[in-house]
């Protein structure tokens, strides 16, 4: 789950190519995140399905944005811009 050091959580499952792409975008930008495999965490799966009302992955949760559900590279770019600007003090 998210910590003060990793403000982004990506909920995913094995074999999810869009999840891998999103992780690669964040890695390339140097943005830290946690990954939660929904097939191994029943509590997280319930949270994603019942609270977030998400039926597809990836699901990206952060304190500063609405959850990003599904593969939405434009929204991920906004998230990256926000976190990289925050790190540089802009």
UniProtKB/Swiss-Prot annotation:
It holds the Pfam family Glutaredoxin. Transmembrane segments: none annotated. GO terms for molecular function: electron transfer activity. This is Gene 56 protein. InterPro entries: Arsenate_reductase-like, Glutaredoxin, Grx-like_ET, Thioredoxin-like_sf. Keywords: Disulfide bond, Redox-active center. The keyword Disulfide bond applies. Disulfide bonds join 16-19. PANTHER family: GLUTAREDOXIN (PTHR34386), GLUTAREDOXIN-LIKE PROTEIN NRDH (PTHR34386:SF1). Residues 1-90 form the Glutaredoxin domain.
């Amino acid at each position: 789950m998210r910590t003060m050091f990793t403000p982004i959580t990506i909920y995913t499952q094995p074999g999810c190519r869009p999840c891998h792409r999103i992780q690669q975008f964040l890695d390339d930008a140097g943005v830290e995140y946690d990954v939660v495999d929904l097939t191994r965490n029943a509590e997280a799966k319930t949270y994603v399905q019942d609270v977030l009302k998400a039926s597809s992955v990836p699901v990206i949760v952060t304190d500063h944005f609405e959850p990003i559900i599904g593969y939405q590279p434009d929204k991920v770019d906004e998230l990256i811009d926000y976190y990289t600007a925050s790190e540089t003090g802009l």
